Amino acid sequence: DHLPHDVYSPRL
């Protein structure tokens, strides 16, 4: 179970 990458490291 893992959250979308944008949750803890948003794409700039």
Curated annotation (Swiss-Prot):
Protein name: Pyrokinin-4
Keywords in alphabetical order: Amidation, Neuropeptide, Secreted
BP term (GO), one: neuropeptide signaling pathway
Tissues with expression: Corpora cardiaca.
Secreted among keywords: yes
Major subcellular location class: secreted
Organism in which the protein naturally occurs: Periplaneta americana
Subcellular location: Secreted
Residue ranges of coiled coil: none
One Gene Ontology term, aspect cellular component: extracellular region
Function field: Mediates visceral muscle contractile activity (myotropic activity).
Top-level taxon: Eukaryota
Residues annotated with Leucine amide modification: L12
Family classification: Belongs to the pyrokinin family.
